[in-house]
Design a protein with these regions (language model features):
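Interhelical loop and helix-boundary elements at the membrane-water interface
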Residues: 1-132
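Juxtamembrane boundary at the C-terminal end of a transmembrane helix
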Residues: 138-145
Length: 145
């Protein structure tokens, strides 16, 4: 399918890639949370973030890869790129979340703010994007376009 004929061509290529990034990170967070909460048994990196599980990590990677594949189809790109871009984006999102946890621990804070009640603060809302955005950008510029 040509890019001009792609279902998401109506939003424009740049907006489509931004939407891919946002949905990929959200799908990682959601997949990791749901799988970790329901099936998580094997804890990892508990000294940084006590609730992280390997099962949650895998669930997040799978969710991200599926969403990235669907988005790539919508953008008129080869969905096989999702086999690389999905896990890379998921792991970058996890790294951003863990980096923010390290900063909070070093500061002796449970949350990074109170502006959004129940969500740990503004930094918790963007931590995954800080690491995932450069990964998606570099991948797309180097290999997709």
């Amino acid at each position: 399918m040509a890019q001009a004929d792609a279902p998401l061509s109506i939003v424009g290529a740049e907006r489509g890639w931004i939407l891919l990034l946002v949905l990929a990170v959200w799908s990682y967070d959601t997949g990791a949370y749901l799988v970790g909460k329901n099936f998580g048994r094997t804890k990892f990196l508990t000294h940084i973030s006590p609730s992280k599980t390997i099962e949650g990590l895998v669930g997040g990677v799978v969710a991200t890869t599926v969403v990235v594949a669907v988005m790539l189809l919508g953008l008129g790109q080869n969905p096989l790129h999702a086999l690389i871009l999905g896990p890379l984006t998921a792991l970058a999102a996890q790294a951003g979340d863990l980096a923010e946890s390290v900063i909070k621990r070093a500061a002796g804070a449970k949350d990074s703010g109170t502006i959004i009640p129940g969500h740990g603060g503004m930094l918790d809302r963007v931590d995954s994007f800080i690491f995932a955005a450069p990964v998606v950008t570099l991948y797309v510029l180097a290999l997709v376009r």
